[in-house]
Amino acid sequence: MRTKNNFAYIDGANLHKGAESLDWKFDYKRFRIWLREKYGVEQAYLFLGFVPKYKDLYTRLQEYGYTLVFKEVIFDGEGKAKGNCDADIVVRAMQDTYENKFTKAILVSSDGDFSPLVKFLISKNKIEVILSPYETKKCSVLLKRTGVKIAYIAEQQSILEHKKH
Protein backbone atom coordinates (compact mmCIF):
# COMPACT_ATOMS: atom_id res chain seq x y z
CA MET A 1 0.00 0.00 0.00
CA ARG A 2 1.66 3.19 -1.21
CA THR A 3 -0.77 5.95 -0.32
CA LYS A 4 -3.77 6.40 1.94
CA ASN A 5 -7.11 8.11 1.56
CA ASN A 6 -7.75 6.61 -1.85
CA PHE A 7 -11.36 6.23 -2.99
CA ALA A 8 -12.80 3.35 -5.02
CA TYR A 9 -15.67 3.99 -7.41
CA ILE A 10 -17.28 0.64 -8.10
CA ASP A 11 -19.69 -0.02 -10.96
CA GLY A 12 -21.82 -2.53 -9.04
CA ALA A 13 -23.59 -4.06 -12.05
CA ASN A 14 -20.31 -4.44 -13.95
CA LEU A 15 -18.59 -6.01 -10.95
CA HIS A 16 -21.51 -8.38 -10.33
CA LYS A 17 -21.69 -9.54 -13.95
CA GLY A 18 -17.92 -9.82 -14.18
CA ALA A 19 -17.80 -11.85 -10.96
CA GLU A 20 -20.51 -14.15 -12.30
CA SER A 21 -18.38 -14.82 -15.39
CA LEU A 22 -15.50 -16.15 -13.27
CA ASP A 23 -15.17 -19.88 -12.75
CA TRP A 24 -14.78 -19.27 -9.02
CA LYS A 25 -16.93 -17.60 -6.35
CA PHE A 26 -16.01 -13.94 -5.83
CA ASP A 27 -15.89 -12.76 -2.19
CA TYR A 28 -17.05 -9.16 -1.67
CA LYS A 29 -15.72 -9.09 1.90
CA ARG A 30 -12.23 -10.15 0.82
CA PHE A 31 -12.40 -7.64 -2.04
CA ARG A 32 -13.04 -4.77 0.39
CA ILE A 33 -10.12 -5.83 2.59
CA TRP A 34 -7.88 -6.21 -0.48
CA LEU A 35 -8.84 -2.73 -1.72
CA ARG A 36 -7.76 -1.30 1.63
CA GLU A 37 -4.54 -3.30 1.93
CA LYS A 38 -3.35 -3.20 -1.70
CA TYR A 39 -4.56 0.25 -2.78
CA GLY A 40 -5.07 2.20 0.46
CA VAL A 41 -8.82 2.55 -0.19
CA GLU A 42 -10.46 4.32 2.73
CA GLN A 43 -13.80 4.93 0.99
CA ALA A 44 -15.32 2.32 -1.35
CA TYR A 45 -18.41 3.61 -3.12
CA LEU A 46 -20.51 0.80 -4.56
CA PHE A 47 -23.04 2.13 -7.07
CA LEU A 48 -26.03 -0.07 -7.78
CA GLY A 49 -29.71 -0.13 -8.58
CA PHE A 50 -31.96 -0.60 -5.56
CA VAL A 51 -34.00 -3.82 -5.64
CA PRO A 52 -35.94 -4.32 -2.35
CA LYS A 53 -35.61 -8.12 -2.34
CA TYR A 54 -31.82 -7.74 -1.95
CA LYS A 55 -31.93 -5.68 1.25
CA ASP A 56 -30.12 -8.39 3.25
CA LEU A 57 -27.29 -8.35 0.71
CA TYR A 58 -27.11 -4.56 0.96
CA THR A 59 -26.83 -4.80 4.74
CA ARG A 60 -23.99 -7.33 4.42
CA LEU A 61 -22.14 -5.16 1.91
CA GLN A 62 -22.35 -2.21 4.30
CA GLU A 63 -21.04 -4.40 7.11
CA TYR A 64 -18.07 -5.28 4.87
CA GLY A 65 -17.24 -1.57 4.62
CA TYR A 66 -18.80 -0.44 1.34
CA THR A 67 -20.68 2.85 1.06
CA LEU A 68 -23.71 1.97 -1.05
CA VAL A 69 -24.98 4.56 -3.50
CA PHE A 70 -28.38 3.55 -4.83
CA LYS A 71 -30.09 4.44 -8.06
CA GLU A 72 -33.76 3.87 -8.74
CA VAL A 73 -34.19 0.78 -10.88
CA ILE A 74 -36.17 0.75 -14.10
CA PHE A 75 -37.13 -2.41 -15.94
CA ASP A 76 -36.57 -2.99 -19.63
CA GLY A 77 -39.06 -4.63 -21.99
CA GLU A 78 -37.92 -8.09 -20.89
CA GLY A 79 -38.34 -7.32 -17.18
CA LYS A 80 -34.59 -7.02 -16.51
CA ALA A 81 -33.62 -4.43 -13.91
CA LYS A 82 -31.43 -1.52 -15.03
CA GLY A 83 -29.78 0.80 -12.52
CA ASN A 84 -27.94 3.06 -14.98
CA CYS A 85 -25.40 4.29 -12.43
CA ASP A 86 -22.69 5.48 -14.85
CA ALA A 87 -23.53 9.19 -14.61
CA ASP A 88 -23.75 8.95 -10.81
CA ILE A 89 -20.25 7.48 -10.66
CA VAL A 90 -18.86 10.20 -12.93
CA VAL A 91 -20.51 13.02 -10.98
CA ARG A 92 -19.38 11.65 -7.58
CA ALA A 93 -15.80 11.12 -8.75
CA MET A 94 -15.58 14.58 -10.31
CA GLN A 95 -17.16 16.24 -7.27
CA ASP A 96 -14.77 14.43 -4.93
CA THR A 97 -11.85 15.47 -7.17
CA TYR A 98 -12.81 19.14 -7.15
CA GLU A 99 -13.35 19.03 -3.38
CA ASN A 100 -9.95 17.28 -3.02
CA LYS A 101 -11.46 14.51 -0.88
CA PHE A 102 -9.06 11.75 -1.93
CA THR A 103 -5.48 11.15 -3.00
CA LYS A 104 -6.06 8.69 -5.86
CA ALA A 105 -9.10 7.02 -7.43
CA ILE A 106 -9.51 3.34 -8.15
CA LEU A 107 -12.18 2.68 -10.78
CA VAL A 108 -13.77 -0.77 -10.73
CA SER A 109 -15.35 -1.32 -14.14
CA SER A 110 -14.65 -2.67 -17.61
CA ASP A 111 -17.05 -0.18 -19.22
CA GLY A 112 -15.63 2.13 -21.89
CA ASP A 113 -18.23 4.77 -21.01
CA PHE A 114 -15.86 5.74 -18.19
CA SER A 115 -12.95 6.64 -20.48
CA PRO A 116 -13.76 10.41 -20.34
CA LEU A 117 -13.75 10.20 -16.52
CA VAL A 118 -10.43 8.35 -16.60
CA LYS A 119 -8.95 11.03 -18.89
CA PHE A 120 -10.20 13.73 -16.51
CA LEU A 121 -8.65 11.93 -13.52
CA ILE A 122 -5.37 11.59 -15.45
CA SER A 123 -5.39 15.35 -16.11
CA LYS A 124 -5.71 15.95 -12.36
CA ASN A 125 -3.14 13.24 -11.45
CA LYS A 126 -5.87 11.49 -9.46
CA ILE A 127 -6.09 7.94 -10.85
CA GLU A 128 -4.25 4.95 -9.42
CA VAL A 129 -5.63 1.99 -11.37
CA ILE A 130 -8.62 0.54 -13.16
CA LEU A 131 -9.71 -2.81 -11.76
CA SER A 132 -11.47 -4.72 -14.51
CA PRO A 133 -14.10 -7.24 -13.42
CA TYR A 134 -13.83 -8.83 -16.86
CA GLU A 135 -10.86 -10.56 -18.47
CA THR A 136 -8.59 -8.57 -20.76
CA LYS A 137 -10.45 -9.29 -24.01
CA LYS A 138 -13.77 -8.12 -22.50
CA CYS A 139 -12.36 -4.93 -20.97
CA SER A 140 -13.19 -1.96 -23.18
CA VAL A 141 -10.54 -0.84 -25.63
CA LEU A 142 -11.54 2.74 -24.73
CA LEU A 143 -10.25 2.17 -21.19
CA LYS A 144 -7.11 0.49 -22.50
CA ARG A 145 -6.37 3.47 -24.75
CA THR A 146 -6.25 5.84 -21.76
CA GLY A 147 -2.88 4.33 -20.80
CA VAL A 148 -3.89 3.89 -17.16
CA LYS A 149 -2.74 0.69 -15.47
CA ILE A 150 -5.47 -1.95 -15.63
CA ALA A 151 -5.48 -4.89 -13.23
CA TYR A 152 -7.78 -7.83 -13.79
CA ILE A 153 -9.83 -9.20 -10.92
CA ALA A 154 -9.75 -12.68 -12.48
CA GLU A 155 -5.99 -12.76 -11.82
CA GLN A 156 -6.56 -12.36 -8.07
CA GLN A 157 -8.35 -15.67 -7.47
CA SER A 158 -6.03 -16.74 -4.64
CA ILE A 159 -6.89 -13.55 -2.75
CA LEU A 160 -10.50 -12.88 -3.75
CA GLU A 161 -12.04 -16.34 -3.96
CA HIS A 162 -14.72 -17.11 -1.39
CA LYS A 163 -13.37 -19.81 0.91
CA LYS A 164 -15.74 -22.34 2.45
CA HIS A 165 -15.42 -22.41 6.22
Where are these regions (language model features)?
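Terminal and domain-boundary accessory regions
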Residues: 1-165
